[in-house]
Structures are given as structure tokens and as C-alpha cells.
Amino acid sequence: MTKQEVTYEAKGQILIIHLPKELDHHSSRNLKYETDLLFAENYINKVIFDFSKTEFMDSSGVGILLNRYKQMARSGGKVNLYGANRQVNSILMMGGIMKLMEHYDTKEEAVFR
């Protein structure tokens, strides 16, 4: 996996998005395009963002997270996240993400709650 590559894992109606090392303008643009396609082709009622490999995130990353949250909220879905390090956690808090999404330490917690 390159530093900008996002990977996806589907578990029924749950989409787990494994974020790259850097969630910046470039990777956020790709993430938006790819998730738009996945949402159009599949019924998804929960999105989980995996931050375990993410070391850097800018405002574009915050923007795409907010966009995906709003999209899921409109359809009655849920968004969780897990694995954020201290630096990314700080950005998520400043961006208001932590007030909107449930955050967990592990993938298992994020999937089953």
C-alpha cells in the first residue's frame, strides 16, 4: 500500500475504510470519488474509518469526514472511527469530528457498537 492508497473492506452493510498514512487533499479527493461509487452501488448503513496507519491529516481530511458523516446521517446510517494516534486525535477534536462520530480503540469495538 502506498502512502496515499485507501483500501476498503465490506462486511455486510458495513464499510470499513482503511485510511492512508497521509489524509490530505489528494487522498481526500480520491476517497470522495471512491466512496461515492461504493455508496451508489451498495446499501451501507455504517461506515468505519480506520486511522491506525494515518500520521498526518489536513483540513481536506476533516472535510471529507464531515461530508461522509452528513451523507450517512441523511440516510439514517452511523459513522465510527478507530485507531487515531494522539496527533490525528487532536485534529479530529479541533475539527469537531469527535462530537459527531463514536471513536474506539479497536476495529472490533467500532464494528460491533
Give names to the regions the model predicted.
Residues 21, 85, 107:
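Short, flexible active-site-adjacent loop segments at beta-strand->alpha-helix junctions, enriched
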Residues 25-100:
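Amphipathic alpha-helical interaction surfaces in cytosolic regulatory modules
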Residues 102-106:
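Short acidic-hydrophobic, aromatic-tinged amphipathic segments that line or gate anion-handling sites
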